[in-house]
Amino acid sequence: MLAVVADAQQLRQEAFELINLDYPGLEKVKAACSRQKWEAAAQELLNYYRSRTGITHPDIDLKNLTISKEEQKWADDALEHTFFVHKGYQPSYNYGKDINWEYWPVKDNELRWQLHRHKWFTPMGKAYRISGDEKYAKEWVHQYMDWVQKNPLVNMKQEEFELVSAGEVKEDADNVYFAWRQLEVSNRLQDQTCQFLLFCSASAFTPEFLTEFIVNYHRHGAHLLKNYSAEGNHLLFEAQRMVYAGVFFPELKDAAIWRESGINILNREIKKQVYNDGGQYELDPHYHLAAINIFCKALRMADCNGFRNEFPSEYLDTVKNMIAFYANICFPDYTNPCFSDAKLGDYQAELANYRDWLALFPDCDWICLLYTSDAADDSLRV
């Protein structure tokens, strides 16, 4: 199966039309393109990415990678096409030797949507980088190309798309309404930046595959740019992930458009979605928490790559106000009330949030106290 997929890879000449060949560092790529030496151009582009400096990813440190037992299991299971899709459906389902991306063992839309988030891809990347075992990279390339080939982006009827996106179970809905929902598109845009770093050095990551990756990645960005969700936390997720795409791949001609689009939406929506008391307008503790982390993630990605000034000081003030709101609605053990669509949360996860927030607000005494204090001490509410 791996050989079949490898043979199916093509050197996608159109990838070079998507790239700004005048971007610093791409001189050899441009020279090869000018001679129409596409194989040489693809190899030079891969050489460039394997040695690229100047772009920082705040979510991953290749020099200090770790993998949990759970992640290792997801990676190993994925080799047999048993995919971790949803914690609510365990043990995970097997999707067949010839992967069936439309397999729907339980008629829950979340199970169908979240299959297309490829949650096991990043653990496979970690397993590859830590072990050096090419089997993870070969299988990732296989699954990546298999997904591209079996999940084409085709025209969608808006009314059908809205029904499926709203959560109505539509057993007769075309696969595209699940595979290409905006939230899943944005999830792949974000996570594939880490996966790119994890797998780029692999032998299985060929010059031909790189061109396939670029064409597919650009398809995602172009689609999302024209099809953002109308409102709410989904729109925030999509905008933040568009920032990731634009910042991480500045070589793409549309990179600045993507980055600016995401940042503009976040700057607009933080005023629209957050009340004066710091509460996010969907009034759900975990949506509120997600919104905080969305705003913070976009800021971190911009900050470590030279775009911090595209977020005004009011943006940071609002984020801090949101953190204070969240601290005040949580219980002394750092769990939160379970109203609306919220989950309980747990101490370790919430402590990690305060650690990340403290990195953005190092001079904030009360965030420091909430991060370093005993969880049972309820005297620290702000």
What are these regions (language model features)?
Residues 2-230, 236-243:
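Extracellular glycan-targeting catalytic surfaces
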Residues 130-134, 153-160, 276, 302-309, ...:
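Surface-exposed helix-capping loop/turn segments at secondary-structure junctions
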Residues 205-209, 236-237, 247-248, 253-306:
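The feature captures the catalytic groove of carbohydrate-active enzymes
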Residues 134-150, 201-227, 253-269, 307-329, ...:
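Extended, well-ordered alpha-helical scaffold segments
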Residues 120, 372, 376:
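Conserved adenylation A10 loop of the ANL superfamily
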Residues 177, 231, 280-284:
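Alpha-helix N-cap/helix-initiation motif
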Residues 279-373, 381:
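Carbohydrate-active enzyme catalytic cores, enriched for enzymes
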